[in-house]
Amino acid sequence: MRTLWITAVLLVGVEGHLLQFRKMIKKMTGKEPIVSYAFYGCYCGKGGRGKPKDATDRCCFVHDCCYGKVTGCDPKWDYYTYSSENGDIVCEGDNPCTKEVCECDKAAAICFRDNLKTYKKRYMTFPDIFCTDPTEKC
């Protein structure tokens, strides 16, 4: 519980991209991201290893891979701009790097939404010591 509280405090205090990603997830899924996704499966949250546990965890795996392709900015901290039109997220701005980060986040938020029916509470706070399968490549 303490880790969850610390994560919540850190994310609320961030003015850059992590707070934006949180808002995007909330908009697309209706779920509170810190509670529902920060420690989900083997790939949601910090780091990642092993094989994704389900479709939601795979969203995080793909998101990590997407971040791995971004060059020229810091995907976790650089600020980007986006708007929401008719329920769709539109990434904006002139900076190609931060726009790419926004597109990674948008794809993950949509993936979470599209997999809400298979979301499993048992993976909400899944201990990574159980992520022992060979790690997949992007």
UniProtKB/Swiss-Prot annotation:
Q: What is this protein called?
A: Basic phospholipase A2 PLA-B'
- The active-site annotation reads 63, 105
Pfam families associated with the record = Phospholip_A2_1
UniProt cofactor note: Binds 1 Ca(2+) ion.
Biological processes annotated in GO:
arachidonate secretion; lipid catabolic process; negative regulation of T cell proliferation; phospholipid metabolic process
Documented EC number(s) = 3.1.1.4
Name the job this protein performs: PLA2 catalyzes the calcium-dependent hydrolysis of the 2-acyl groups in 3-sn-phosphoglycerides.
